[in-house]
């Protein structure tokens, strides 16, 4: 009984200290997304939130803050908080009651492995280009809810751990930042190798027969990799996901995160 109570207390404590995000796409026609984040149990007098200036696998500075506007911050009661800035990519927020909510508009129109793209065909998200973070809270778990457009038949594909519906989780900021996401009316194929799932998510306008042909080639490459190395890696949650977007509106790029692969081309 004591162990159960201790476990329950620990679970509630972790939940209270989870940073949560939501993102919605009502104005996708103008390449805009609305991002909201909540940072609970903040102990410091101020909290610095910022946009990243780098991205996994990209050895250059990218000023992602240039695509953010309409920033505002409130406390747990919904009251506005004082915000100061001392550089182009950070916001310093005064803490009044331990809860800090932020909201901003993201402009996104470069689909690839570095930036993000939002339009009426999809939301193609590179996490560092999309979500603010608090460096002092980087070890906290994260929950993210993608408000996918039902009127456009959007679904969510990502390497993040699925919780329920369109809500996913990451154990910390590092994992979150390395988890690109494709939200669209995509198609998918999958097969099992040694008890693990290899999934291919494809967002493109081509017929199913072309996807079937492509998928057989992908499977052959995966199996050949296993033959060369003797085994496949142990993937998180038993799954590896290819996230492919082949469309005239993307920029053309690729990137290899931890348990997924971004592929874009025109």
Regions found by a protein language model. Give the residues of each.
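Extracellular structured ligand-interaction cores
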Residues: 34, 68, 88, 99, ...
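Extended, low-hydrophobicity, Ser/Thr/Pro/Gly-biased non-transmembrane segments
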Residues: 103-186
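A surface-exposed beta-strand-loop module
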Residues: 25-26, 57-120, 134-136
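Surface-exposed beta-strand/loop patches in extracellular or lumenal glycoproteins
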Residues: 33-65, 132-134, 138-149, 156
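Non-catalytic, glycine-rich low-complexity segments
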Residues: 17-27, 37-38
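Zn2+-dependent metallopeptidase catalytic core
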Residues: 64-67, 107, 139-157, 169-175, ...
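Bacterial Sec-dependent N-terminal signal peptides
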Residues: 1-21
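Juxtacatalytic substrate-recognition/specificity segment
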Residues: 187-266
């Amino acid at each position: 009984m004591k162990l159960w109570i201790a476990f329950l207390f620990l679970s509630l404590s972790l939940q209270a200290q989870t940073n949560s995000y939501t993102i919605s796409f009502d104005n996708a026609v103008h390449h805009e997304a609305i991002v909201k984040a909540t940072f609970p149990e903040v102990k410091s007098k101020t909290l610095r939130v910022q946009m990243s200036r780098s991205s996994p696998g990209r050895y250059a500075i990218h000023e992602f803050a240039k695509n953010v506007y309409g920033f505002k911050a409130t406390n747990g009661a919904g009251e506005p908080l004082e915000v100061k800035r001392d550089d182009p990519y950070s916001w310093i927020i005064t803490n009044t009651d331990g809860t800090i909510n932020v909201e901003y508009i993201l402009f996104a129109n470069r689909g690839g492995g570095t930036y993000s793209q939002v339009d009426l065909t999809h939301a193609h998200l590179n996490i560092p280009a999309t979500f603010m973070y608090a460096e002092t809270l980087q070890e906290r778990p994260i929950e993210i809810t993608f408000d996918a457009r039902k009127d456009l038949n959007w679904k969510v594909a990502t390497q993040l751990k699925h919780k329920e519906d369109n809500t996913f989780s990451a154990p910390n900021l590092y994992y979150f930042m390395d988890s690109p996401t494709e939200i669209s009316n995509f198609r998918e194929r999958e097969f099992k190798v040694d008890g693990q799932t290899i999934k291919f998510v494809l967002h493109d306008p081509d017929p199913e027969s072309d996807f079937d042909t492509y998928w057989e080639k992908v499977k052959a490459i995966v199996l050949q990799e296993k033959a060369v190395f003797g085994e496949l890696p142990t993937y998180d949650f038993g799954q590896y996901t290819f996230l492919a977007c082949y469309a005239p509106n993307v920029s053309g790029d690729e990137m290899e995160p931890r348990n997924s692969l971004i592929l874009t081309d025109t």
